[in-house]
């Protein structure tokens, strides 16, 4: 069956510094090289959507949502505990089957260049690919995929690796650029796809911070995790949260993340 999706990225004329990236963190990024690109597309059907089979990949690291629900992250980490100096020989694709409802299907993807973990491995440039077969209530199937009809933007709220600042401008949406000479050779991953599970810290609890007050809360986990931080907060004004992470037997903190 003919491939439906095309590799897309930010427009190369408007974003010349956010095209290429190091193949691994062993190769330092150039100034202006870091980028959190976002891609979106809405599909409206006559009949209700029942389910979707999705094939998706991104370079270097991607996160996919459908109808505001988390689908997955990837690609499966092909690297190891070493620094790569050559582009990744194969780029793995993730495959998902998800249930749907309603006549509207919305995709949103975030793709980061360069990688930030030692096992992240790249072809040396940013890209995103998705194709899906959507089953409708009348029994018909619609095949869709990424192309120049998707929208793209560089989200300025991610100014640096591991930093998110809601106060910054997310940036305008613009037509995605369809990459004319893709460098990726997609292969089904021979290892399990990445997965998310919610892990509560030991002794997790709610707490209240008064206006103008600063509080420091320390929590521990039962072991080391590769994780992202999820916070639930109700605020009545500006609020800055700084989280730092360290191993229990180390005195120095890892880089901070501003939320």
Tell what function each PLM region has.
Residues 1-259:
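Extracellular/oxidizing-compartment recognition motifs
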């Amino acid at each position: 069956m003919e491939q439906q999706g095309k590799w897309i990225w930010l427009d190369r004329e408007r974003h010349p510094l956010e095209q290429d990236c190091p193949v691994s963190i062993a190769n330092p990024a150039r100034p202006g090289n870091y980028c959190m690109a976002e891609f979106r597309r809405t599909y409206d059907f006559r009949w209700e959507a029942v389910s979707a089979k999705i094939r998706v990949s991104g370079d270097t690291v991607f996160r996919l949502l459908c109808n505001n629900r988390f689908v997955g992250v990837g690609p499966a980490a092909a690297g190891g505990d070493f620094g790569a100096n050559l582009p990744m020989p194969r780029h793995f694709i993730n495959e998902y089957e998800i249930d749907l409802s309603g006549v509207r299907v919305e995709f949103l993807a975030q793709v980061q260049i360069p990688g930030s973990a030692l096992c992240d491995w790249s072809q040396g440039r940013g890209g995103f690919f998705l194709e899906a077969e959507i089953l409708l209530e009348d029994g018909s199937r619609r095949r869709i995929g990424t192309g120049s009809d998707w929208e793209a933007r560089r989200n300025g709220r991610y100014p640096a690796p591991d930093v998110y600042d809601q106060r910054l401008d997310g940036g305008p949406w613009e037509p995605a650029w369809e990459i004319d000479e893709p460098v990726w050779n997609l292969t089904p991953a021979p290892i399990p796809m990445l997965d998310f599970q919610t892990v509560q810290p030991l002794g997790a609890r709610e707490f209240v911070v008064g206006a103008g007050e600063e509080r420091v809360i320390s929590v521990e986990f039962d072991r080391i995790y590769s994780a992202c931080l999820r916070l639930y907060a109700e605020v009545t004004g500006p609020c800055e949260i700084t989280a730092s992470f360290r191993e229990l037997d180390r005195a120095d903190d890892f880089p901070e993340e501003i939320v």
